[in-house]
Regions:
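C-terminal substrate-binding/cap subdomain adjacent to the FAD-binding core in PCMH-type
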Residues: 1-106
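Conserved glycine-rich FAD pyrophosphate-binding loop
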Residues: 77-216
């Protein structure tokens, strides 16, 4: 968790215009979840088990090569196991991230949580390997799957995230979902919070513009 949080921090502070960064952890050993990570992200250089962090850089070949060299030094990538996707691998990979394909066939609840980047470590520490989730926006956007008939866990997650200056909405409800708090409706206040959080670490909208709402 500390390594991923540190990598996100370095990515956010990089001057090399990284346009996206996401972390996909190991799936929890729980039969209530669909174990599909390996299938969803099966590419030539990603056909292996385990969690991984992915980042995207865009531009012409010379620019990409130069920035990739700089980023490799910034993140100390020589000490980590890495793979590089070509254009025809990268496009479908990020499409799968944006389309939430990890949760495509789930009948469970799916939550969306937005938190300040500095709180990423705390949220990861809360979720650990108990939930199926992934992180986007270099640590500020969490997509969390919570099993059906476990509304109390949704409440616990929501309370913790709100205490850490974030908010939660539900984007997919399970058949037996029975949670009625207004926290799960999108309103102007949450939109403003989302904008403020994203602008704090992405003032020029490099990270997946339009990912959350048209404006952000």
């Amino acid at each position: 968790i500390k390594i991923i949080s540190s990598l996100f921090d370095k990515i956010l502070s990089s001057s090399n215009e990284i346009s996206a960064a996401a972390y996909i952890p190991d799936e929890p050993k729980n039969k209530k979840y669909d174990f599909n990570k390996s299938k969803v992200f099966k590419f030539n250089d990603l056909d292996r088990e385990g969690s991984f962090l992915a980042f995207r850089i865009e531009g012409d070949q010379i620019s990409i090569k130069e920035r990739l060299n700089d980023i490799s030094k910034e993140l100390n990538l020589s000490k980590l196991k890495t793979s590089k996707l070509d254009f025809f691998q990268s496009v479908p990979f990020w499409k799968k991230i944006n389309n939430l394909e990890l949760f495509a066939n789930t009948k469970n609840n799916v939550l969306r949580a937005i938190v300040p980047p500095a709180k990423c470590f705390k949220i990861m520490n809360l979720l650990k390997n108990k939930f199926k989730y992934f992180i986007d926006w270099s640590g500020s956007l969490f997509w969390i799957e919570v099993p059906d008939k476990e509304d109390i866990k949704i409440s616990e997650i929501k309370d913790f995230i709100v205490k850490n200056n974030g908010f939660v909405t539900i984007v997919k409800k399970s058949e037996n979902f029975d949670f009625v708090e207004k926290i799960f409706t999108s309103d102007e206040t949450k939109l403003l919070i989302s904008k403020k959080i994203k602008e704090s670490f992405d003032p020029v909208s490099l990270f997946n513009p339009g990912r959350m709402y048209r404006e952000i």
